[in-house]
Design a protein with these regions (language model features):
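Cytoplasmic helix-loop-helix junction between adjacent transmembrane helices
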Residues: 99-133
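Intracellular juxtamembrane helix-capping segments at the cytosolic ends
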Residues: 106-120, 311-326
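A late C-terminal transmembrane helix in Major Facilitator Superfamily
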Residues: 326-356
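Hydrophobic core of transmembrane alpha-helices in multi-pass small-molecule transporters
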Residues: 11, 92-108, 217, 298-312
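Structural signature of the two symmetry-related core transmembrane helices
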Residues: 69-83, 274-289
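Helix-loop boundary and gating motifs at the non-cytosolic
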Residues: 1-47, 215, 223-234, 245
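Helix-to-loop junctions at the C-terminal end of transmembrane segments
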Residues: 53-66, 148, 259-271, 354-355
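A membrane-interface helix-boundary motif in multi-pass transporters
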Residues: 35, 146-164, 352-371
Length: 397
């Protein structure tokens, strides 16, 4: 049972996000009468709150060297958020709830990965756990739309509450096992080993950290751009049925899981920055292919490149940040925030790219150029890596 706790927790946190993220706009419109403009503002404020929470809560956990306790609080806040959103009818109150309650509640998955790193988990373990989160994202959005379609908008809030209860239970059991280990160590007169994650010296200098963070913001932005514009691009530029956009995104999500597992295995033998460089090359090829694709067969085939590109960003990126920044909570929070900032940057990418003579195809050419820029930045950052330490994580727990 104990071995199933971390995978179960990863699946539940993934389901929570996969249920809420695609359904939130519908909830705001149908339950609170929000206009499109209001939805944009609310989501922006909500993401800003999440950005701050992703820094403060993990930093507090670092200070206490305790990640499961705050993770339990995040589960309780998720349950409270679902209850509040189902009860209120005012958009301003719902917005306040999303910022004050939803922001911290969304940090739970970050704390799980920080807990793993604090306990000395290997890069392979972390990437495999991240693959489980991707499994949740394969099933979560379709299941969420099914629940809303058959049972109404408030039903998805009930589903989120149910997931939160399971999350609370799983985390409580993890805390019980941890406390039992501490008591057993005290009874034997032994001291728990110092967490490797907090004892390591960063193999990357401050300049390297800044460069890699900048590169990841670009990579996250291009990935978010492709996901955001795919449906519109397929229908308006390729003149295909909208179902092909859904098929393409579904195939990409399904391929992410084996890609993450494969890149996790490779991380034990190859440089992390080198693997990320291969994902950048795949991303450049993917965006160039999208810019010139004309039919559904190539559109679907290109998702293999998309999956490998994402595996580098999501799979290797997380343990790389945890290695660069010895504090597990802060490093994980900063990594998660590169996605939030990247999502913000994706808006200008879409606006700028669509103004070119190529129309929407120009968006993907812009993405290819930005990914190439990210690759160059990573190559420069690699030169700042300390030769004595390398740029990969230990392969053992």
């Amino acid at each position: 049972m104990r071995r199933l706790l971390v995978p179960s927790s990863a699946l539940l946190w993934g389901l929570q996000l996969a249920f809420l993220s695609p359904a939130l706009a519908l909830i705001l419109v149908n339950l609170y009468g929000a206009t499109t403009t209001e939805v944009g503002w609310v989501l922006g404020i909500y993401n800003a709150g999440g950005f701050v929470a992703a820094l403060l809560l993990p930093a507090y956990a670092d200070k206490k060297h305790n990640y499961l306790g705050p993770m339990l609080v995040c589960g309780a806040l998720t349950l409270l958020l679902a209850v509040v959103l189902a009860s209120v009818t005012s958009l301003p109150i719902a917005t306040i709830a999303l910022v004050v309650i939803g922001g911290p509640a969304g940090v739970g998955s970050s704390l799980l990965f920080a807990h793993l790193r604090h306990g000395g988990a290997s890069a392979v373990d972390i990437v495999n756990t991240r693959a489980i989160v991707s499994v949740a994202w394969v099933a979560g959005p379709p299941l969420a739309t099914f629940i809303i379609g058959w049972f109404g908008n408030r039903a998805i809030l009930l589903a989120i509450a149910a997931v939160a209860v399971l999350n609370i239970t799983t985390t409580a059991v993890m805390i019980t096992y941890r406390n039992a280990d501490v008591r057993a160590a005290a009874a034997d007169g032994t001291q728990p080993a110092s967490p490797a994650a907090t004892a390591e010296e960063s193999p990357v200098g401050r300049l390297g950290i800044v460069l890699i963070m900048g590169a990841f913001i670009l990579l996250q932005a291009t990935n978010a751009t492709a996901m955001t514009i795919m449906t519109v691009y397929v229908t308006e530029t390729l003149h295909l049925d909208v179902q092909w956009a859904g098929i393409a995104l579904g195939v990409a999500a399904a391929l992410e899981v084996p890609a993450l597992i494969l890149i996790g295995r490779l991380s034990g033998r190859h440089s992390h920055l080198g693997l990320i460089a291969t994902s950048c090359v795949a991303g450049i090829a993917f965006y160039l292919g999208l810019a010139f694709v004309t039919g559904p067969v190539l559109l679907i085939g290109l998702q293999v490149l998309n999956a490998w590109s994402f595996a580098g960003i999501a799979g290797i990126g997380l343990p790389l940040f945890q290695q660069m920044i010895p504090r597990p909570g802060l490093s994980t929070g900063l990594y998660m925030n590169t996605r939030r900032v990247g999502s913000i940057v994706s808006g200008p990418i879409i606006a700028f790219g669509s103004l070119t003579a190529l129309g929407q195809r120009g968006i993907f050419l812009t993405c290819a150029g930005l990914t190439l820029t990210g690759l160059v930045i990573i190559a420069i950052a690699r030169r700042t890596t300390k030769p004595a330490r390398g740029d990969r994580l230990p392969a053992t727990t």
